[in-house]
Regions:
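N-terminal segment immediately downstream of the Sec signal-peptide cleavage site
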Residues: 1-56, 139-155
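Generic recognition of long tandem-repeat/solenoid scaffolds
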Residues: 14-17, 93-95, 123
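Predominantly extracellular/secreted and cell-surface proteins with exposed
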Residues: 26-102
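Intrinsically disordered, low-complexity acidic/polar segments
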Residues: 68, 104-106, 122, 132
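Solvent-exposed coil/turn segments that connect beta secondary-structure elements
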Residues: 96-102, 116-118, 126-128
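A short, surface-exposed beta-strand/turn
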Residues: 106-124
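C-terminal partner/receptor-binding element of secreted or periplasmic proteins
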Residues: 119-167
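Short, solvent-exposed mixed-charge patches
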Residues: 170-172
Length: 172
């Protein structure tokens, strides 16, 4: 079943933004994450996938301390789906991924991806395999409505014209 009103292309790929605050070693907000993800798993069953149509989940995001220091990048790739379950308006997708860390890529990292009300996505990565790099909370993201994505792309294609228009309107 297609996601109602959400961005989805002809191959069933859905994408969205990572926008999350992660706790530091003291359990307090210490890091900001910002980036993107895309997947084909949303609103599908495990039987939807096979060797010629594998489950996909990829993400890339920047991570910086709240003061702007220690900026670095992470990628999540090589998703392997092992289980799908649903409870209420939340669907959970479990599997393993490869994630880049300072020391290099770490393979076979357990992940749980949750989709809530088709608007919010969370990524929970195994803290042991990642040396607690992402703190003690899930990484949060959003699933934008297709209309919002189209509007954003339209504004981006207009380039400086959009910025000039907003600047002129704010000066009135």
């Amino acid at each position: 079943e297609a996601i109602p009103n959400n961005w989805q292309d002809q191959k069933g790929l859905v994408f969205g933004a990572i926008s999350s605050i992660q706790n530091n070693n003291q359990g307090k907000p210490g890091w900001v994450l910002s980036g993107h993800w895309f997947t084909n798993i949303i609103n599908k069953t495990k039987d939807s996938f096979n060797q010629t149509n594998p489950a996909k989940f990829d993400s890339w995001f920047y991570m910086s301390m709240l003061d702007g220091s220690a900026m670095h990048k992470h990628t999540i790739s090589n998703f392997s789906l092992s289980d799908i379950s649903s409870q209420g308006n939340t669907t959970s997708y479990k599997g393993t991924v490869t994630i880049t860390l300072k020391e290099g890529p770490v393979k076979e990292v357990p992940i749980e991806i949750k989709v809530m009300n088709n608007h919010v996505i969370t990524l929970s990565l195994d803290a042991t395999k990642t040396n607690k790099h992402f703190g003690d909370t899930p990484i949060y993201g959003i699933i934008p409505a297709r209309a919002d994505v189209m509007k954003m792309m339209s504004h981006m294609s207009m380039g400086n014209k959009t910025m000039d228009m907003h600047m002129n309107m704010s000066q009135k």
